[in-house]
């Protein structure tokens, strides 16, 4: 199978950073609504500064501890930012920056694809005390209607200690609330349930749970797959615990891209022959073809080394590629 992912071009190096970035602050978080979060503790951005029409600088700070991102059995992970944490910071920066350049605050960004490349050698050169990040965000809109962006990509550089430690891009569409509701109902035929309606979900009673250490975790709450099968083609069911507020910060009507990405990482870890060693993930790519519904089983399946597809109701809804 050929993954849908296309290589992202590098950020335009002719873009200059305003000297005033020294004024970006790191002493308080931005309004949680700017990153679509309910809990302030889940907000990692601290400042936003628009540089030009489509270029935004964002300040962020790595959390000193976190129930999900810092839950790892690998000692080496303590000195390296978790890949999913960098993805979440990039996601928050994309949302906040999009609103900064003209996307209405009431609209929803629907992700179709993302790519994260991490540079471990740059991270290794950092001062262990470094926690402040600078994220350069540049938008390339592919559709604009009535002066408002409707679809496109955001390209990002994540910088710590004057070093680019990672690059990220994401692409997708922007929908109003009414457009999103119509899309969801048209696809399903009925309005989708939400995580607030626990009795309607299919993964509240997990069968054949996996030991946390099998997927690099300590806390069972952070295990998002179950019914692991490694005999031939490795497969697992995607069964996140809705009590995990780090994953379900508010009520959702689908399984999020963050959870599906973590499911891919956990299946990757569970099927590695040297799973006792801490993997240094250098890149993650993801594509999303449809929403992962809450009321029908979701399966993740390995199709090659480091490559996975997510399926629901006998159709592919996402794919991932991970590299160490």
Name these PLM-found stretches.
Residues 167-173, 315-324:
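Short amphipathic beta-strand/extended segments with alternating polar/hydrophobic composition
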Residues 1-78, 175-247, 324:
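Non-catalytic linker/capping segments at the edges of enzyme domains
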Residues 68-76, 99, 103, 123:
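Flexible, membrane-facing loop/turn or short amphipathic-helix motifs
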Residues 114-163, 280-316, 321:
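Hydrophobic beta-sheet segments that form the core/acyl-binding groove
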Residues 147-193:
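Loop-centered beta-sheet repeat module
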Residues 60-66, 105-116:
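A short glycine/small-residue-enriched secondary-structure motif
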Residues 219-289, 297:
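Acidic/His-leaning functional-site neighborhoods
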Residues 81-108, 255-276:
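Active-site helix/loop of acyl-thioester processing domains in fatty-acid/polyketide metabolism
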